Amino acid sequence: MPLLNSIATPYSEALLQVAEARGESEQTANQVKELLQIWESSPELRNAMTSQVLEPEAKKAALMKLFSEQLTPAFTNLLKLLADRKRISALEAVLLRFLELYRDIHRIALAEVTSAIPLNEEQKELLRKKIQVVAGTNNVELKLLVDPSMIGGFIVSVGSQVIDASLAGQVRRLGLALAKLG
């Protein structure tokens, strides 16, 4: 991934710089998240855009037809540039790196929350408030994942900190406590 990061970072930094200068960084970040969801959920799109058979002009035309109406001009220009330079295969890395940089400069903590079932709005808000205290910032972005194999509870990862409030985690801690007694 380091090579991909060295390719992605200059493009990400440029997009962020232009978006910040135009006052569109939050809008661009939201568009990046939406495009990432589409990219990750559509193998057909990924395969077509990373295909060596499809010419850069065809890729660019397809991307513009699909996304130009919904994206800021800076974001649209990034897609064109990646297509022109035959770097569209690095799109996911560029977008992920953009979000990292955006969160860094806006001091937004990313909390990955894995739960056994989807959380309701009240649970999300309560969790967000607790994470704000742990992360030391009022800006918290939740990335919610559902893993039914957890049975119950949740696990929160913020940076290098992990809070395991899962049923399996509680059983494991209980087992360790009993092992120390015996």
Curated annotation (Swiss-Prot):
It is a peripheral membrane protein. Gene3D superfamilies: N-terminal domain of the delta subunit of the F1F0-ATP synthase. Its main location: plastid. It is found in: Plastid, Organellar chromatophore thylakoid membrane. InterPro entries: ATP_synth_OSCP/delta_N_sf, ATPase_OSCP/dsu. SUPFAM superfamilies: N-terminal domain of the delta subunit of the F1F0-ATP synthase. Keywords: ATP synthesis, CF(1), Hydrogen ion transport, Ion transport, Membrane, Organellar chromatophore, Plastid, Thylakoid, Transport. One of its GO terms (molecular function) is proton-transporting ATP synthase activity, rotational mechanism. GO terms for cellular component: organellar chromatophore thylakoid membrane; plastid; proton-transporting ATP synthase complex. NCBIfam families: ATP_synt_delta. F(1)F(0) ATP synthase produces ATP from ADP in the presence of a proton or sodium gradient. F-type ATPases consist of two structural domains, F(1) containing the extramembraneous catalytic core and F(0) containing the membrane proton channel, linked together by a central stalk and a peripheral stalk. During catalysis, ATP synthesis in the catalytic domain of F(1) is coupled via a rotary mechanism of the central stalk subunits to proton translocation. This protein is part of the stalk that links CF(0) to CF(1). It either transmits conformational changes from CF(0) to CF(1) or is implicated in proton conduction. F-type ATPases have 2 components, F(1) - the catalytic core - and F(0) - the membrane proton channel. F(1) has five subunits: alpha(3), beta(3), gamma(1), delta(1), epsilon(1). CF(0) has four main subunits: a(1), b(1), b'(1) and c(10-14). The alpha and beta chains form an alternating ring which encloses part of the gamma chain. F(1) is attached to F(0) by a central stalk formed by the gamma and epsilon chains, while a peripheral stalk is formed by the delta, b and b' chains. HAMAP family: ATP_synth_delta_bact. Belongs to the ATPase delta chain family. This is ATP synthase subunit delta, organellar chromatophore. The gene is atpD.
